[in-house]
């Protein structure tokens, strides 16, 4: 069930923020593009469309070598993850 998978998924996205910060500091736009692509592809699968949208923003920014937008996407992902509260509802 997703309920069992979501905590690990979110841990991985938090790790991605750190990976992205290192890549950003190195100016590694290809790594940021690839990471953004991965984030974009996984977010919606877990019900986090906002994560997918942020991943898309990071992917596009890095593909266009737009460091300012890439940095903003990384910050947005970190803020989103820090503000996220998960509530499971029995149906």
PLM features: what roles do these ranges have?
Residues 1-38, 45, 64, 68-91:
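Long, amphipathic alpha-helical coiled-coil segments characteristic
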């Amino acid at each position: 069930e997703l309920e069992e998978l979501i905590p690990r998924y979110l841990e991985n996205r938090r790790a991605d923020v750190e990976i992205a910060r290192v890549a950003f500091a190195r100016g590694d736009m290809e790594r940021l593009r690839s990471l953004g692509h991965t984030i974009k592809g996984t977010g919606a699968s877990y019900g986090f469309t906002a994560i997918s949208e942020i991943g898309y923003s990071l992917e596009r920014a890095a593909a266009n070598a737009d460091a300012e937008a890439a940095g903003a996407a990384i910050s947005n992902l970190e803020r989103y993850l820090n503000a996220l509260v998960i509530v499971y509802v029995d149906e």
